[in-house]
Amino acid sequence: MIGKLKGVLDEIGEDHCVVDVGGVGYVAHCSARSLSTLGSVGTPVTLFIETYVREDMIRLYGFRTVLEREWFRLLQNNVQGVGAKVALSVLSTLTPSELANAIALRDIATVARAPGVGRKVAERIVTELKSKAPAFAGEAAGAIGLKQDLGEGVAPAPVSDAVSALANLGYSRDIAANAVAAALKSAGEGADTGTLIRLGLKELAR
């Protein structure tokens, strides 16, 4: 099994790249996010690989970080109806920490933004991975803490709305969720959307 490729970027396609390792070109299928970070042809590149072996083919999936590869495995191994194509679509739309945030906040709509992922599949992703997401949270510690504060239910509308509002102002969902987590601790669980946004912005201004 191939676990990592380190070589020179030889080609970038719509959903894959070719890495030249010692004169041998390896085709690795990647998320759009991974492809966008590879740089130009001819530059050194390292990919963490997930190898699929079937009777009629061997397919390599490449990831820029070990965390992204772990989420690729997690999605397929734990969520019914999610294969490699859907997993790559999710990871093309959301970073690992954004995905962990969405699961922590039970933000089904954010997960459903990925092409080919309807609400039912997004709901399964959120439900099936809610207990596993903390171990793969990456930078999403604020949202994980927020989820623990809220308990097992769906995040109240003011919380989800506040995160979305801060994200619409240009902050990443990671940063927005962390700010709302701090705001919620300060204001209490009964806080409305406006209060959470105001306190969240105050937190971001520090």
Curated annotation (Swiss-Prot):
Gene3D superfamilies referenced in this protein's UniProt entry, alphabetically: 5' to 3' exonuclease, C-terminal subdomain (1.10.150.20), DNA helicase RuvA subunit, C-terminal domain (1.10.8.10), Nucleic acid-binding proteins (2.40.50.140)
Coiled-coil regions listed: none
- Region (Flexible linker) location: 145-154
Alphabetically, the GO molecular function entries are: ATP binding; four-way junction DNA binding; four-way junction helicase activity
Chain spans, region Domain III: 154-206
> Where located?
Cytoplasm
The GO annotation for biological process reads: DNA recombination; DNA repair
Query: Origin, by domain of life?
Result: Bacteria
Region Domain II, residue ranges:
65-144
Q: Which HAMAP family match?
A: DNA_HJ_migration_RuvA (MF_00031)
Q: How does it assemble?
A: Homotetramer. Forms an RuvA(8)-RuvB(12)-Holliday junction (HJ) complex. HJ DNA is sandwiched between 2 RuvA tetramers; dsDNA enters through RuvA and exits via RuvB. An RuvB hexamer assembles on each DNA strand where it exits the tetramer. Each RuvB hexamer is contacted by two RuvA subunits (via domain III) on 2 adjacent RuvB subunits; this complex drives branch migration. In the full resolvosome a probable DNA-RuvA(4)-RuvB(12)-RuvC(2) complex forms which resolves the HJ.
State the family named in the UniProt similarity comment for this chain.
Answer: Belongs to the RuvA family.
Name of the featured protein: Holliday junction branch migration complex subunit RuvA
Q: What is this protein's gene name?
A: ruvA
